[in-house]
């Protein structure tokens, strides 16, 4: 379940959801609920949260020390995969299993395309290393780990500038002794400078490909997520927020900042999962058992099923295939993650498409007469409408009208507003010009 507690008198809980376009803040406590929406800051996502803390202090007169917990949903993990901005990653595996990551499963997204190429592995073959060791299916050691070989690999990792390592050995889900020893050797040889992800820590389950892929995804996003949550925790304390930081997981629960830094693969659907949990709660309040949760974001749209009052869940998920897909749609086009997820399908909201209205019709190729463009996260959700401005659910959402008096906020064609909803309930806008 979502982290939830009742704040004490003059105590508050701060909830933060960072999306690709907007950051939403909710402050709850002392009998009140306040909200804030602001543009996300992709150069440093934590900046939007810290700015919210400043506004809480300045606008509401609330001391940051009164915030006793921060609950955070984030898209940092999934964006790192989708944008291919993860760490330079290596894989250490049992001799003979170097290519499991590339061979994958039989599934492919297109059945009759002879030109289809599988997605490039997150770890290229030259960075996949084999070690001499072997465990039986019962966990008994059949061949001792060659520690000298591991030390040689550590030297290669240093030469190659590797930032993160996934370790996945055969049958380590039964006996993790060799994986843990490799982790110790890497820590000693590399001085703790390389992020290490052990499959026995992340997914101690049978099935080599799924376990390897999950460990590799964890390693690939590990340094990025670790640095982010550690920086956010430190900077929150510097602003006076002493309460713990809780991070939303893909299954709808929360984990500590330290756990999130060690197991970031659990955060891939952090933000969308929170929305589904909220939808299920609202549906129960309305007496509805079976509903569809739909979340229109600035950069992606998400949908999930709520059945018999509970979000549908899965342990089979795929990320990085252009979209993140639910278990019913997994076809092998992305990177497998076998962890608990709320069963969410996610698609991109579009690219730099233009929409506008001319004298007679709705036009989708843009133009001078009332243009709306999809903007990236750094530009925010600018919406430009012929005759008036309307805040919308996402970058590409557009409401086209003719009479400015019907909506107010009349502006000349070719001008838009980046809307911000403040804690005091007012709206202010920053003028954007074409």
Predicted regions and their residues:
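Short linear motifs in low-complexity or flexible loops
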Residues: 355-364, 368, 372-382, 392-393, ...
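Polybasic, low-complexity intrinsically disordered segments
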Residues: 395-399, 410-434
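Acidic, glycine-rich loop-and-strand cores that form catalytic or ligand-binding grooves
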Residues: 385
């Amino acid at each position: 379940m979502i982290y939830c507690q009742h704040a004490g008198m003059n105590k508050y809980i701060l909830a933060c959801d960072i999306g690709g376009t907007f950051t939403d803040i909710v402050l709850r406590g002392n009998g009140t609920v306040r909200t804030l929406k602001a543009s996300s800051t992709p150069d440093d996502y934590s900046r939007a949260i810290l700015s919210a803390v400043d506004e809480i202090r300045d606008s509401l007169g609330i001391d940051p020390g009164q915030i006793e917990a921060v609950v955070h949903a984030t898209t940092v993990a999934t964006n790192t995969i989708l944008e291919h901005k993860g760490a330079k990653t290596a894989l250490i595996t049992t001799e003979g299993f170097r290519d499991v990551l590339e061979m994958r499963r039989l599934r492919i997204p297109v059945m009759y395309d002879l030109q289809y190429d599988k997605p490039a592995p997150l770890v290229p073959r030259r960075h996949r290393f084999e070690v001499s060791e072997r465990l039986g299916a019962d966990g008994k050691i059949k061949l001792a780990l060659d520690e000298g070989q591991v030390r040689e690999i550590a030297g290669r990792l240093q030469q190659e500038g590797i930032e993160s390592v996934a370790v996945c050995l055969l049958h380590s889900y039964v006996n993790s002794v060799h994986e843990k020893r490799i982790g110790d050797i890497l820590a000693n040889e590399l001085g703790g400078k390389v992020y290490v992800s052990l499959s026995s820590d992340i997914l101690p389950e049978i099935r080599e490909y799924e376990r390897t892929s999950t460990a590799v995804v964890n390693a690939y996003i590990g340094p990025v997520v670790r640095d982010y949550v550690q920086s956010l925790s430190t900077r929150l304390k510097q602003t006076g927020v002493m309460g713990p930081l809780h991070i939303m997981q893909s299954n709808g629960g929360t984990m500590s900042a330290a756990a999130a830094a060690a197991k970031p693969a659990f955060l891939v659907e952090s933000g969308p999962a929170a929305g589904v949990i909220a939808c299920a709660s609202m549906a129960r309040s309305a007496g509805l058992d079976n509903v569809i949760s739909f979340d229109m974001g600035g950069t992606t749209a998400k949908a999930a099923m709520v059945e018999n009052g509970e979000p549908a869940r899965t342990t089979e998920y795929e990320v990085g295939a252009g979209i993140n897909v639910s278990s019913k749609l997994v076809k092998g086009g992305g990177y497998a993650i076998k962890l608990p997820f709320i069963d969410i399908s996610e698609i991109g909201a579009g690219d730099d498409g233009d929409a506008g209205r001319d004298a007679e019709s709705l036009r989708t190729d843009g133009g001078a007469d009332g243009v709306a463009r999809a903007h990236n996260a750094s530009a925010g959700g600018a919406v430009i409408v012929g005759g008036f401005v309307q805040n919308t659910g996402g970058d590409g959402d557009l409401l086209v009208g003719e009479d400015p008096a019907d909506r107010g906020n009349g502006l000349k064609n070719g001008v838009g507003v980046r809307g911000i909803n403040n804690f005091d309930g007012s709206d202010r806008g920053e003028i954007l010009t074409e």
